[in-house]
């Protein structure tokens, strides 16, 4: 039990990461139409926020804290609009997948950083972002960071979750990694339903069908090493984003054929 239940900080981590995930989803959904693949909404929202933070921080030196507040307000408005338009923000299948992996979520929220690259880059960069409120520069060096010029897209996730929590969250990346895999599981279900010509399966999202999507992404190995899924490494998010791009490209080719 000590590996699953430790203290109240586990609840704080889960709630904060979930808030960021819903914000990503709301923003992504607001950018798409009724015919979109809803499972890709978080990726779209994350991408737009990454572009906004990078542009504002690099070109105009706008503090991250101010951008976070603006992003929160925008996401709240987008969430209300999407809810009224679609009747919800997060697909019901995703919520069922979360319920199926509650023990895994408890384990992840009890975890702390443990891998070498986390201490040299993946958690130290977001900590600098949280403490300095700006990108690294001549006047704001990140002295202990190994790769300060590395793209910041993935670091925004840990930063935003920590900003919501009010404390630095070492396990935010691991939680988002699992959320991303579950999201991709819904895409796998959509492809299966399309292949067997039963699109109604996606709409019904019964427990058996949903569990198949979860098994497809959690039991398989999405990266070169399964253990890094439960870390702040960027390999899992990169794999999911790449897979999403491949699927979208394939669907575009099918539509044009």
Describe every region a protein language model picked out.
Residues 1-88:
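Membrane-embedded, hydrophobic transmembrane alpha-helices
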Residues 4, 85-92, 194-206, 256-257:
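Membrane-interfacial, low-structure loops and terminal tails that flank and connect transmembrane helices
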Residues 31-46, 91-95, 201-213:
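Membrane-interfacial loop-to-transmembrane alpha-helix junctions, especially the N-terminal start
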Residues 79, 93-117, 220-221:
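Transmembrane signal-anchor helices characteristic of membrane glycosylation enzymes that use polyprenol
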Residues 16-23, 44-48, 71-72, 154, ...:
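Transmembrane alpha-helices of multi-pass, membrane-embedded glycan-processing enzymes
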Residues 6-9, 13, 57-58, 205-240:
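Aromatic- and kink-enriched transmembrane "portal" helix at the membrane-lumen/periplasm boundary
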Residues 23-24, 28, 237-256:
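Specific aromatic-rich, kink-prone transmembrane helix
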Residues 106-211, 226-232:
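Active-site lumenal/periplasmic loops and adjacent helix-entry segments of GT-C-fold
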